[in-house]
Swiss-Prot record:
One of its GO terms (molecular function) is DNA binding. CDD domains: TOPRIM_recR. It holds the Pfam family RecR_HhH. The keyword ATP-binding does not apply. The gene is recR. A zinc finger (C4-type) spans 58-73. May play a role in DNA repair. It seems to be involved in an RecBC-independent recombinational process of DNA repair. It may act with RecF and RecO. PROSITE patterns: RECR, TOPRIM. InterPro entries: DNA_Rcmb_RecR, Rcmb_RecR, Rcmb_RecR_Znf, TOPRIM_dom, TOPRIM_RecR. It comes from Desulforapulum autotrophicum (strain ATCC 43914 / DSM 3382 / VKM B-1955 / HRM2) (Desulfobacterium autotrophicum). Keywords: DNA damage, DNA recombination, DNA repair, Metal-binding, Zinc, Zinc-finger. The keyword Ribonucleoprotein does not apply. It comes from the Bacteria. This is Recombination protein RecR.
Length: 199
């Protein structure tokens, strides 16, 4: 039997639908919000509404943006001749944190997965081909995941773009910094050995 008032139970139920939030965490969050000052609860509610109302997809790269074009695509200092292809907007965040890339991005919206009914038409591959085949593009870097779906997506895009004469590269994968060899799987070790370079 639930001993909380219905409004608290409703919030617990809503919060527990979020990824990684179970009932106990949702309960703690709901009680925290209940005991927080009213202006904090209003700010949280307003931020959620603003997020839903303002955040959309960039018309160029399909990343998250609150403007028609995202901050990266509208930045004249970015190298518009190189496009890095990723599966989701959070992949851009990871690459940007590294500081290793200064070009533009293209978010596919997932990876090919025939078992789940996701083919090329369900992703933003057609839009990628249109951008990649422009005269200003000199290279397309494929930065999809290293799982089966990511590799299949990379292979498909690479094959199609090479037929169109586009220079395509794939990000390297291998042993992580500080990684212990005994925990590295065979495929990762094989790729690390194949992708080795001069020192």
């Amino acid at each position: 039997m639930d001993l909380y008032p219905e409004s608290i139970l409703n919030l617990i139920k809503s919060l527990s639908t979020l990824p990684g939030i179970g009932r106990r965490t949702a309960e703690r969050l709901a009680l925290h919000i209940l005991h927080a000052p009213l202006h904090e609860a209003q700010t949280l509610a307003n931020d959620i509404l603003e997020l839903k109302q303002k955040v959309t997809l960039c018309r160029t790269c399909f990343s998250l943006s609150d403007q028609p074009e995202c901050r990266i695509c509208s930045n004249p200092r970015r190298d518009a001749s190189i496009i890095c292809v990723v599966e989701k907007p959070t992949d851009i965040v990871a690459i940007e944190k590294s500081g290793a890339f200064s070009g533009l991005y293209h978010v596919l919206g997932g990876a090919l997965s025939p078992m789940d009914g996701i083919g090329p038409d369900e992703l933003r591959i057609r839009e990628l081909f249109s951008r990649a085949c422009s005269k200003t593009t000199t290279e397309v870097i494929i930065a999809t995941g290293t799982n089966v779906e990511g590799e299949a997506t990379a292979a498909y895009i690479s094959d199609q773009l090479r037929k169109k004469g586009v220079n395509v590269t794939r990000i390297a994968s291998g042993v992580p910094m500080g990684g212990d060899f005994q925990y590295v799987d065979q495929v990762t070790m094989q790729r690390a050995m194949e992708g080795r370079r001069g020192f």
